[in-house]
Amino acid sequence: MTLFSCSVQMPLEERSLTNLPLNLLFRILSHLDMNDLQNIGKTCTLLRMLANENIVYRNAVIGSNGNMWWTKNVLVDVFDVLNFNRKAMKTLNSHNISLVASLRNVQRKYKLGVIDPARKTISYRTNEVESKEKGSVKDLNMDLNEPTEITREQIAHTAILQGMNQFIELNDKAFRTHSADSDDTYIEENNGEIHSLHGLEKNTTFEEDLVKKPPFIPSPTFSNYSRSSTNSVFSSSSPKLLDDDWNNITMDFTKSRDPDYKEMTPTSTESSDSITRLRKSNKVKDKAELFEKLIFRDSRPLKTKKKDNPRLKLSSSLSANDEDFRKIISPPSDILPKVGRRSVSRGYLEEIERHYPDFNGETTNPLAIKRVNSTKIANYEQLIIKENSSNCKGITEKNDENKFQRSHTSPVIELSKPHQRSKLKAVVTDGNKICYRKIELDNPSGSNTNDHVIKRLDANTDFNI
């Protein structure tokens, strides 16, 4: 009997992209195009949050002129810390807080990881010149100063990681407190300093922490830094969200498609009195409800009814009997802008009095103005009918030719029927006399010319003249 007589097929494990660590997922998404990020962001909530962070990283960090290595290193480590508890990512996302934007603000405020290139070049050249005369004294001074800067950045890096770890612990306790339906007092553990959410230590600035605290070894479980800051999610003060491009660039990823994660949003009918009452309360439930109401109020879109476009679409061919044509010439009152007082020019009044003597100056009467507009519409209709008729086209072409011929002889252009002017023809008689005869255009050419002679003038001159 062979060893491989029976082969048992083991079921394949489910493999998903979300099973990878967060820092590795962030690096993978950083190599994708914008269209691919949008498609991945529509799959689940976790990938949508990472795609949003990647967009902020491209816009704020990569597009900036400062050094970005410090922000990038801290960001990768923060994602590594959040990988153990991904519920904290959803908490940050529910409050529209961006990790990349927050780290970038800290880096800009305290100028972490920024080295002035001009200053570095000048100091290097000075050391190169003076080292030949005075040895390497300047070089030693530079070497003594460099560890100070590196230590300061390392302390900031470690403090941020421990603050994130502290936030994860508070987030877990908040979830457990809400699920157990207990009051705001937490279960006491090894850290006897923290008894409740509002029993945290007093707020201190980052520079004071760097001065007061000696160098310490980072601890993965507990941290004294950043317990309660003004920007913290569970702070007793009013929430302060990031005024960054975070709310603008997440327009494509606002809709979550993860069925397991449901965002709790309060109703829009809550009054401002309840918000004031929740601000004065010290309970964890009231604080969480207050944050949800404030975020819902800030991020709630305005519900406005879509109004129909008042602009009318022009059809390919308009006629006098078409309803669209009437709307263009005389639009209805609901489309026209509402004006409290209408100013009418003096020239317009004189023109109305000249065309309509019985108008009696009733310019403020809307019925009179409407009557004038209806008369104009009738004139436009007749003009369009006349221009579109086939007989009128031939008449207008003939009139144009006649006007062109008369323009060389007479500067006056008459609007009425052109006058057929009589022409005289010079005729030489047998006695070498010149006489003028009138030529009628309407008569046939074969008729007797002697019957149409009106006037005969004797020149009494020779033919040679």
UniProtKB/Swiss-Prot annotation:
The keyword Mitochondrion applies. Residues 14-60 form the F-box domain. The gene is MFB1. It holds the Pfam family F-box-like. Residues 253-279 are annotated as: Disordered. This is Mitochondrial F-box protein MFB1. Residues 265-275 have a biased composition (Polar residues). It is found in: Mitochondrion. Keywords: Mitochondrion. InterPro entries: F-box-like_dom_sf, F-box_dom, SCF_F-box/WD-repeat. It comes from the Eukaryota. Residues 254-263 have a biased composition (Basic and acidic residues). Present with 1360 molecules/cell in log phase SD medium. One of its GO terms (biological process) is SCF-dependent proteasomal ubiquitin-dependent protein catabolic process. GO terms for cellular component: mitochondrion; SCF ubiquitin ligase complex. Its main location: mitochondrion.
